[in-house]
């Protein structure tokens, strides 16, 4: 049995000001997006022919960051705590309180990329296929931030690597944040980076992202402690699982359509 180290959530103390680990994880995700994106533009010439430049990459990050933050926050309020935020709508703006939803952030990014595509004269799936392999690094960094903060812990377990989170209780639990780091971060990155290493049918890389993330998230949710204010929903599935199922279904449909073109 392992014990969570209970890290200080503030990574860097600067007098009365502190830089939190979770903020650093966002920064790592954004910087990795730029570095990997520039590598692809320089070493995979078909992306340049599709209209990708360093300027477009920088602007895509700006649009995407807005989509992640706004969509993630609104998604959390809508999917997880809608009753609370209906009576406290102004607190949606308090980003330092409450949480963020990946599925809301994903929808926010889709809207942002639609606007970006229209403004730059690019195709939506041309953008999403380029962006999709860059995203898992940020997802993995975010899950590592969850682990450092000791949040989103797993269900009770007697496995050798089960971990006690002392600030929660004395029960050994799945370190589900690390499972998500390995699957949604490392495994999904390797899969998408490999698949997109040569030209593919338009939409197929995006489809693989939907299938991969949705499947990994659905599986890990079986080890993750359900949100106390929601519990399990219909068929004993969590909110995260119900939100991930449409991603898998849409991904399978999109992959079939893409490969038939």
Swiss-Prot record:
Keywords: Cell inner membrane, Cell membrane, Membrane, Transferase, Transmembrane, Transmembrane helix. Its EC number is 2.5.1.145. The keyword Mitochondrion does not apply. GO terms for cellular component: plasma membrane. It is found in: Cell inner membrane. PROSITE patterns: LGT. NCBIfam families: lgt. Belongs to the Lgt family. This is Phosphatidylglycerol--prolipoprotein diacylglyceryl transferase. It comes from Methylobacillus flagellatus (strain ATCC 51484 / DSM 6875 / VKM B-1610 / KT). The lineage of its organism: Bacteria, Pseudomonadati, Pseudomonadota, Betaproteobacteria, Nitrosomonadales. The gene is lgt.
């Amino acid at each position: 049995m392992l014990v969570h180290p209970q890290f200080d959530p503030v990574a860097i103390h600067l007098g009365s000001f502190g830089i939190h680990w979770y903020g650093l994880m966002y920064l790592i995700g954004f910087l990795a997006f730029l570095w990997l994106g520039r590598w692809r533009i320089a070493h995979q010439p078909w992306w340049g022919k599709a209209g990708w430049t360093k300027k477009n990459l920088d602007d895509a990050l700006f649009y995407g960051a807005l989509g992640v933050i706004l969509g993630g926050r609104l998604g959390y309020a809508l999917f997880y705590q809608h009753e609370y935020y209906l009576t406290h709508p102004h607190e949606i703006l308090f980003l330092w309180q409450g949480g963020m939803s990946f599925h809301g952030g994903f929808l926010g990014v889709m809207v942002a990329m639609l606007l970006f595509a229209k403004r730059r004269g690019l195709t939506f799936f041309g953008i999403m296929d380029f962006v999709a392999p860059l995203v898992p690094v940020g997802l993995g960094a975010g899950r590592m931030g969850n682990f450092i903060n000791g949040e989103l812990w797993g269900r009770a377990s007697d496995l050798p690597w089960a971990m006690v989170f002392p600030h929660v209780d004395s029960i050994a639990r799945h370190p589900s944040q690390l499972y998500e780091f390995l699957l949604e971060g490392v495994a999904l990155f390797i899969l998408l980076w490999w698949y997109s290493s040569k030209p593919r049918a338009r939409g197929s890389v995006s489809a693989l992202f939907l299938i991969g993330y949705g499947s990994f998230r659905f599986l890990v949710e079986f080890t993750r402690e359900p949100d106390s204010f929601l519990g399990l929903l219909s068929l004993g599935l969590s909110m995260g699982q119900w939100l991930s199922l449409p991603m898998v279904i849409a991904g399978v449909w999109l992959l079939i359509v893409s490969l038939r073109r």
